[in-house]
């Protein structure tokens, strides 16, 4: 088992989550919500831990299927643990278990919630809840395939572990390019749906 390569992947996952946590912080700033500072704090922690973990690239970055499975499971656990921290730090969820359930529900696109009225949350938290569903729709590890330099076999094993079904199809010969195409389509569909909702009279938020 290549644990150093798995640790390297997890460090990148933390950096990405730190960057993503800046979005709800910005939303909170726009709505002048003091609670949004917790999103910035957790974002900084994630980025610092991620940078420390990627300072030394492992000599062997080869990924086999078992490493892919471990990296996938550990990545989703890491995302959920750190992603739920702002929810409990803002004081909007009664317990960490509830906050963790909420974020796991988001990243897995389950849609379940422990709250009877989500509208009582601040704008930053409302955005983060919705954003986790959007992130989970494609998968963070698919995004990693576009930015982490790995061998083709390692990319495929990581993709196999992340994707449902017994096999993974590629739109183009290079898996990195496939991930890029998938995200372009995903972004495009998101923009189209936002425009349609705006035309239907819904506010941007």
Residues of each region from the PLM?
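Membrane-proximal intracellular helices of multi-pass ion channels
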Residues: 1-205
């Amino acid at each position: 088992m290549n644990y150093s390569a798995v640790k390297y992947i997890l460090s990148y996952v933390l950096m990405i989550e730190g960057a993503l946590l800046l979005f709800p912080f910005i939303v909170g700033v726009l709505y002048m919500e003091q609670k949004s500072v917790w999103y910035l704090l957790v974002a900084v922690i994630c980025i610092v831990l991620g940078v420390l973990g990627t300072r030394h690239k492992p000599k062997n970055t080869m990924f086999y299927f078992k490493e892919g499975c471990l990296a996938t499971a550990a990545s989703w656990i890491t995302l959920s643990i750190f992603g739920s921290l702002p929810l409990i730090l803002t004081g909007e969820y009664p317990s960490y278990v509830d906050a963790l359930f909420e974020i796991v529900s988001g990243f897995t696109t389950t849609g379940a919630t422990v709250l009877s009225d989500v509208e009582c949350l601040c704008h930053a938290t409302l955005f983060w809840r919705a954003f986790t569903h959007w992130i989970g729709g494609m998968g963070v590890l698919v995004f990693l395939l576009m930015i982490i330099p790995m061998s083709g076999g390692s990319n495929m094993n990581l993709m196999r572990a992340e994707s449902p079904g017994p096999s993974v199809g590629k739109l183009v010969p290079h898996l990195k390019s496939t991930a890029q195409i998938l995200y372009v389509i995903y972004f495009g569909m998101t923009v189209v749906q936002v425009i349609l909702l705006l035309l239907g009279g819904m506010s941007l938020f």
